[in-house]
Amino acid sequence: MINLLTKTLLFLIVTIGLAFPSQTSCGYCYKKVDGRYIIFETKTYHQSCYQTYIQVKCSHCSKKIDGHYSIYNDKSYHAGCYKKYVQIRCDHCGNTISDAYNIDNDKKYHKACYVNNILEKCDACLNPIEGKYNKDYWGNIYHQKHNDEFPSCDNCNRLMCERITKGGYTIDKKRNICSLCYPKIIVKQSQIINIDKEVKSVLSDIGINNIPSNIPISIVNSMAELDHISTIRLGNVRGYTHYNVNTLAGRKIKEEFHIYVLSNLHELAFKAVLAHEYLHVYLFQNDYDLESDLREGFCNLGSQLILKKDNSIVSNYLLDSMYESDDLDYGKGFIKMNKMLEKKGWNKLLNYLVKLSK
């Protein structure tokens, strides 16, 4: 916010002389002027009337003012009194302010002091930020224009620039991975072994114990490949469970599962996706045919379980992304199922799934 300091300098014009024939009355008492008189701002006064009633007095020291003086907020001051006691001072450098200034949180600053020392600095370019700006989950702030200059990481949504993430890389010209997430990404089958054990252990704690141990888990390199494998349009989904069942006389004789998860996911995101897919397996095993919003919402409860257990800033970011999603299935459906979970708990919710089934 910018205010303009109004500093007015007026010259007190005082002429002292002898009365002349055409002068008839004092501008204050209206009596005839004889002898010495004073002219101030085109009016003539008895010398005593002027000194007693008209002459300007300093609002700080109360002494009479002769010559130049300053007016501020309708009060008059000696130039020295004004500068020393009244004139606004910068809350950063302490020097007086004589022209335009900035107000921030009721403090006043020289424009240069404000821009160079008070304004937030952009984490992408280090220049001061004036006006609107973006702030990410991690506390980084940056000019809005940088959204068009740098990509955002697909895992953490940080701006991929040198000062925020030390850059990153792009996969297939579509997916972006920042250098901060890179050490934690999953790209090899060997990385899955311990993750698989951990996810199954977490699910076992809530009563889901019958997940087959031999389900293959494949890492898929691109969204296009994941779409092709699923044969359905997945949008921004990061995993898919293929299910094949053989029956005889209406009874299951063989079930086959294959889980596909997108590559280059942060380890926590990979765990969350795998937990989601394992709950799909649970639904298939029990023949629970839920509406799509309830189905995906229920499976997202598995992701939530993993992320809450971790309770790191990365997991909290992923959780908040789930809570804020406006997707009808993965967002609103998840919120709906989460309310059921909060009301019933895991044991009752698992038993209640049969009633939710079509």
Q: Language-model segments: which ranges?
A:
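Short, flexible, mixed-charge glycine/proline-rich loop motifs
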Residues: 20-22, 48-54, 80-86, 111-118, ...
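Classical Sec-dependent N-terminal signal peptides that target proteins to the secretory pathway
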Residues: 1-21
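Active-site recognition of the HExxH zinc-binding catalytic motif
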Residues: 203, 272-286, 296-300, 304
